[in-house]
Amino acid sequence: MTNDIHLAFAHPVERAAASSDLPYDRISLRDYTVEVEIGAFQQERGTLQRVRFNVVVEVLPLTGPIDDDVDRILSYDRVTEAIGVELQAERINLLETLAARVAERILLEPQAERVFVRIEKLDRGPFSLGVEIVRARDGQTPAAQEHVEVPHPRVVYLSNAAVS
């Protein structure tokens, strides 16, 4: 159990190394920080905040020689481009949405088999807040939860004069 807890909060590279029996190679992007307007709360609207990305992409090993040819591998710039494209597409409220979209875009790359995406907000307090997801090419997510419709209440403020 202690090892499970350690891995749950370990860096994605360490977790990826311990979580698969398949002979994957891993490409990692660590501590990629950008400023972006993101957040569901009113105080986050119109304000840039720093967001840090850590991404690990598992790829099947090449069957032939690499020949020092960038076109034979999944290049790091494809990972940063996936992040950039999703950040520029539209304003997003939730880190969960952004992480899922980045993962989906990375999995469009033919070499990518599985991707770990961790995103953290760095400016919401003296700590970091974040989300971490795992997605695989086959569409399977570990312990995927089935979609449950949840209520979305609307809150309306009415002054005393309005209700009298």
Model-predicted segments: where are they?
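N-terminal, polar/charged subdomain of small-to-medium soluble alpha/beta proteins
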Residues: 1-164
